[in-house]
Amino acid sequence: MQSEHIRERINQFDNKLYLEFGGKLFDDYHASRVLPGFAPDSKLRMLMQLADQAEIVIAISADAIEKNKVRGDLGITYDSDVLRLIDEFRGKGLYVGSVVITQFSGQHSAAMFKKRLENLGIKVYILYYIPGYPGNIPLIVSDEGYGKNDYIETTRPLVVVTAPGPGSGKMATCLSQLYHEHKRGVNAGYAKFETFPIWNLPLKHPVNLAYEAATADLNDINMIDPFHLEAYGKTTVNYNRDVEIFPVLNAIFEQIFGQSPYKSPTDMGVNMAGNCIIDDEVCREASRQEIIRRYYQAVDGIADGSRSEEEAFKIELLMKQEHITSTDRSTVSPALVRAETTGAPAAAMELPNGKVITGKTGDLLGACAALLLNALKELAGIDHDKHIIAPTAIEPIQILKTKYLGSKNPRLHTDEILIALSATAAESEDAKLALAQLPQLHGCQVHSSVMLSEVDRKTFQRLGCDVTCEPKFQ
């Protein structure tokens, strides 16, 4: 359905469409959480259906290169992510035509990155900084504005413009290309693919509220598209930045083409996700859970200094709109109760069958390591009181940690308990059976009564568990 809709949009123009691709093409876990059944790579697979028609242009701003901007979810710089994306796309059989460096005003590191890409055989184009952008339309749509930018040579009908993250200049790249194509007599088109907010769901639908929670740091606000309402008398949802920029876009389209092909920001979109929802209540509940997860991310961020209080306040307001609290997350109360009764950190996990398992801090294991072991035993049908890892397998790791590696904490972390379990599995059928349950942990919900160590957080992430923590340091 989605790929066919994009083909229709290509045909509306001179067989040339510049598609601004928002959000994540790979590993879109937010979408998969709030839309159960939506695979994290759904957008990529959709694009692969258009592989013979599509080429990819990756945009990165010169400022992001200069400031070593980091992609939060992966912990790598934007310029490193450009190289990663190129490899990922090519590995999937998609054609990467070029990289465009936007907002360039002579930044040395951006020039060095351009040279590095060219040495790798990658075509690189430059879009220059335009004073007064995006308001100074007479300058922007002139030989001194878009006209100064490089014309990106493309060979296929669909040009997908993507980027490592927001603020990379994707829209500016598309509009600059429209200007240059028009100068060359080609009536190219522009469209936008954004999964969220979903335009044909109600404004206050939990799926759309979960998007607001996810972008609370950007101050994105969902709103009724006033231009669409005026043009068609129909209520649709868009977000504030697209609504605010639309008059400017419209004026740019009119300057280039004589008239705008679109009457509203919603018209520009090609997203069909809203038409694919078959169980609304499941999506509503999944989105409520996502809002709670985002709340915990925000308050944990306040504790470690990476987030603002305003972000948490905004998500709290969304929770009040949905009449939910943090304890509506099934693992929160069990983790807190276990921590209170033991007087030490504890954690809880909801298994695929809905049962909640807890883990406490002990002499040998940290709370998360104990939780992991308890969950695997439960899934394997092994009695809770049965030891499946001999103390003789744990003690050498403790000695290594404390005596040789200088650690003050002798308790095993999640990665270490998995290593001990793996070593034991060579001789123990129970350990082997427990280890085989690891794939079942994917998608399980975890809550900790304290903030996790980096190693525990990364282990749960690799296992595919969704983790939240109380904003308390151990």
Model-derived features: where do they sit?
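Phosphate-handling active-site elements
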Residues: 184-188, 381-387
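Flexible phosphate-sensing "switch/lid" loops adjacent to ATP/NTP-binding sites
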Residues: 1-161, 177-329, 333-336, 344, ...
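A short, polar/charged loop-to-alpha-helix boundary motif
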Residues: 364-380
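The conserved Walker
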Residues: 165-166
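Hydrophobic positions on the alpha1 helix immediately C-terminal to the Walker A/P-loop
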Residues: 173
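Substrate-recognition/cap regions that form aromatic- and gly/pro-loop-enriched pockets
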Residues: 383-395, 399-409
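Residue-level structural signal for beta-strand termini and adjacent loop
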Residues: 189, 361-362
